[in-house]
């Protein structure tokens, strides 16, 4: 739930065509137009409670250029720390990747080797779920709720299922099945999910 706390608020005029904040504010002025969630690493030191006065400190921890199958990539590692009464409660790193927009309509399906899981859960995905998650996390990225934009402007085959929503669902599933609160959570996105 900490992703809903202290989101950056931008005027409409400070948003890009994709409805993300224009680059060059908190995140660096990367020239690649496509922004994607590449994962996160979260340390939970102690719980947040209703009524806590939370201070969030955000910084850019690292920027690196790499070459991938789809071309040049720019990785930005953002660091977020959440404090209550000067005590750190949560420390998190977000990995964000920027790249060119490909007009290739044949997006490669990524098959990962999975072992049999002890616990599984099916969810029904719907654009309303993605819209609601976008709203509660203050994520305006149109690829999650604007089908014409996602398919005609960014050339995805469908709406893109939120990487952070995937992470949220995985974390909840693991906590439900372990019947305890996570102390550390690592999530890596390797391909868009539709």
Residue positions per predicted region:
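Catalytic strand-loop segment that frames the active site of acyl-thioester-processing enzymes
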Residues: 1-9, 96-161, 175
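Aromatic-acidic/polar surface patches that form glycan- and anion
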Residues: 47-49, 159-163
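Hydrophobic, proline/glycine-rich low-complexity stretches
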Residues: 1-53
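Short amphipathic alpha-helical segments
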Residues: 38-40, 156, 185
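Alpha-helical transmembrane segments of helical membrane proteins, especially in multi-pass transport
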Residues: 162-171
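A conserved acidic, glycine/proline-rich C-terminal tail/linker
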Residues: 170-194
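HotDog/MaoC-like acyl-thioester-processing domains
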Residues: 37-125, 189-194
């Amino acid at each position: 739930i900490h992703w809903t706390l202290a989101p950056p608020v931008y005027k409409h005029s400070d948003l890009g065509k994709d409805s993300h904040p224009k680059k060059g504010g908190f995140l660096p002025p990367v020239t690649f137009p496509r922004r994607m969630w590449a994962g996160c690493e979260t340390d939970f030191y102690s719980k947040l409670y209703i009524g806590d006065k939370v201070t969030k400190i955000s910084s850019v921890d690292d920027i690196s250029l790499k070459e991938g199958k789809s071309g040049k990539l720019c990785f930005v590692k953002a660091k977020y720390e959440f404090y209550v009464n000067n005590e750190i409660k949560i420390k998190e790193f977000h990995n964000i990747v920027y790249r060119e927009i490909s007009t290739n309509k044949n997006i490669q399906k990524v098959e990962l080797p999975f072992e049999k899981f002890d616990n599984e859960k099916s969810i029904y995905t719907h654009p309303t779920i993605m819209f609601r998650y976008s709203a509660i996390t203050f994520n305006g990225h149109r690829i999650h709720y604007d089908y014409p934009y996602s398919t005609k402007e960014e050339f995805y085959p469908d709406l893109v299922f939120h990487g952070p929503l995937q992470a949220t669902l995985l974390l909840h599933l693991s906590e439900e099945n372990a019947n305890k609160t996570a102390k550390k959570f690592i999530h890596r996105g390797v391909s868009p999910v539709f």
